[in-house]
A protein has these predicted regions:
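Non-heme di-metal
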Residues: 1-148
Length: 148
């Protein structure tokens, strides 16, 4: 909300953000309950979601360029997704500390390490793209300033 610099929009976005947070807590708690009831099945589902996740809007033409613009504004990017969403919920659920996961569930849990490694690589690659974008923007601003 603050990024838009418009008081009415900020207030509306604050309400949306609060509502989204309540949804996140609800779903996080539902998964936690699933882990208590059927840990192996829950880990398989967690794995499926993380392994198939794409950023909202991924299929929209020009998504990558728009994602970079959004990221440079500090709104959202793959690093934030990993650090603010994925890793905290995995810690909350104690995925890697649980002793009630076995068999196929254990394979899915171990493969979560690969997914996290892939997410870190994606975040690193995206940070490079973002840095190049910011560099281009700075050069463009310098050229504009030189014209004045």
């Amino acid at each position: 909300g603050v990024a838009c610099a418009e008081p009415i929009a900020q207030e509306l976005l604050k309400h949306i953000s609060n509502d989204e947070n309540l949804h996140m807590i609800f779903y996080r708690n539902m998964v936690e309950a699933g882990l208590e009831i059927a840990p192996n099945q829950a880990v398989k589902s967690i794995h499926k979601v993380l392994d198939n996740f794409t950023m909202p809007g991924y299929t929209i033409p020009g998504f990558r360029r728009n994602a970079v613009t959004i990221a440079t504004g500090g709104v959202y990017d793959p690093q934030l997704h990993l650090a603010e969403v994925v890793q905290p919920v995995l810690r909350k659920w104690r995925i890697f500390e649980r002793d009630d996961i076995n068999g196929e569930g254990e394979w899915y849990r171990e493969d979560l390490d690969r997914i996290i490694t892939d997410l870190k690589k994606t975040a690193s690659d995206f940070d490079e793209v973002k840095a190049k974008y910011l560099e281009r923007q700075a050069k463009r601003a310098e050229r504009q300033a030189a014209k004045v």
